[in-house]
Amino acid sequence: MAKLTQEEILEAIAGMTVLELSELVKAVEDKFGVKAAAPAVAVAAAAPAAAAAEEKTEFNVELTSAAADKKIAVIKVVREITGLGLKEAKDLVDGAPKVIKENVAKAEAEEMKKKVTEAGGVVTLK
């Protein structure tokens, strides 16, 4: 039997369908008694904990509630922030708690919170 080069093997694999590749992987696992799964690395498990310790940079600005007597002022501010029409802004305020804006920088989120709070709404940053 002629010995195949790595290049020839790679070319043959490149021409296979996904189903054929799946069958090849199973055959290699059976023949050599190995698993195709990558080994878990202990360092990778520590990375999410370190990421959680970092300060959050993007926030969702959520309108929690609006005082009944200040609802019109809150609707105006929500329209200004979101660019929504009158009906959409009213529906958002009436349906609180609802997210006003998602993935906003911290400074911008704080500014939005200040505006809505001054108008009579209650905002949480998530």
UniProtKB/Swiss-Prot annotation:
Pfam family, one: Ribosomal_L12_N
Coiled coil: none
Positions of transmembrane segments: none
GO cellular component terms attached to this protein's record: cytosolic large ribosomal subunit
Biological processes per GO annotation: translation
Keywords: Ribonucleoprotein, Ribosomal protein
InterPro entries hit by this protein: Ribosomal_bL12 (IPR000206), Ribosomal_bL12_C (IPR013823), Ribosomal_bL12_C/ClpS-like (IPR014719), Ribosomal_bL12_oligo (IPR008932), Ribosomal_bL12_oligo_N_sf (IPR036235)
GO molecular function: mRNA binding; structural constituent of ribosome
Ribosomal protein found in the keyword field: yes
UniProt-listed PANTHER family: 39S RIBOSOMAL PROTEIN L12, LARGE RIBOSOMAL SUBUNIT PROTEIN BL12M
Subunit structure, as described in the record: Homodimer. Part of the ribosomal stalk of the 50S ribosomal subunit. Forms a multimeric L10(L12)X complex, where L10 forms an elongated spine to which 2 to 4 L12 dimers bind in a sequential fashion. Binds GTP-bound translation factors.
Role description: Forms part of the ribosomal stalk which helps the ribosome interact with GTP-bound translation factors. Is thus essential for accurate translation.
HAMAP family: Ribosomal_bL12
Family to which this protein belongs: Belongs to the bacterial ribosomal protein bL12 family.
Protein name (Swiss-Prot/TrEMBL): Large ribosomal subunit protein bL12
